[in-house]
Design a protein with these regions (language model features):
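Conserved short beta-strand elements that form part of the metal-binding/catalytic scaffold
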Residues: 29-61, 110-115
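Amphipathic alpha-helical segments
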Residues: 16-29
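A common structural junction motif
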Residues: 26, 83-88
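Short beta->alpha transition motifs characteristic of CBS
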Residues: 50-51, 95, 102, 113-120
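Short acidic/glycine-enriched loop/turn segments that link adjacent beta-strands
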Residues: 34-36, 94-99
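N-terminal beta-strand motif that seeds the catalytic metal site of vicinal oxygen chelate
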Residues: 1-16, 46, 64-66, 117-141
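Vicinal oxygen chelate
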Residues: 5-13, 38-41, 56-83, 99-109
Length: 141
């Protein structure tokens, strides 16, 4: 199997309210508006708000979160606050080393804005690195 592309798909309770939130408050650029829904650019991914159909599962909070990497989480927080976005959890450094700030969309979906510090392991290039059976890098001999 070859995955060619992916996107996160939401079926909001109130399409117009969610459209305004993602477009006007969060500031995502529109990739495509197809009448019954809108697709936004989100870095190298896409987020789609479907204004049609109904989910096959009971209504309830989305069990996950939308993880959005930004260059500067504090500047992002200030920008969102200036647009009237309520910050659910202020920017801070997490025990795992990432800088995170949380916002909640109109349907209760958590958006986690993440800044990866320059010295964080996520920035290390591990291509070609040999690993032992436990998944840890092998020492160079």
């Amino acid at each position: 199997m070859e995955i060619l592309a992916s996107r996160t798909l939401f079926r909001p309770v109130d399409y117009q309210r969610s459209l305004s939130f993602y477009r006007d408050q969060i500031g995502l650029a529109i990739f495509r508006d197809y009448g019954a829904g809108t697709v936004f650019y989100a870095g190298q991914s896409l987020i789609e708000l479907a204004g049609h159909g109904a989910p096959e599962h009971p209504a309830g909070p989305f069990p996950g979160a939308l993880w959005l990497q930004v260059r500067d989480v504090r500047a992002t927080q200030a920008e969102l606050e200036s647009r009237g976005v309520s910050i659910a959890r202020e920017a801070r450094r997490e025990p795992w080393g990432l800088h995170e700030m949380h916002v909640t969309d109109p349907d209760g979906v958590t958006l986690i804005f993440v800044q990866i510090p320059d010295d964080h392991p996520l920035r290390r290039d591990t291509r070609g690195e040999r690993r032992n059976p436990e998944g840890e890098p092998e020492a160079n001999i």
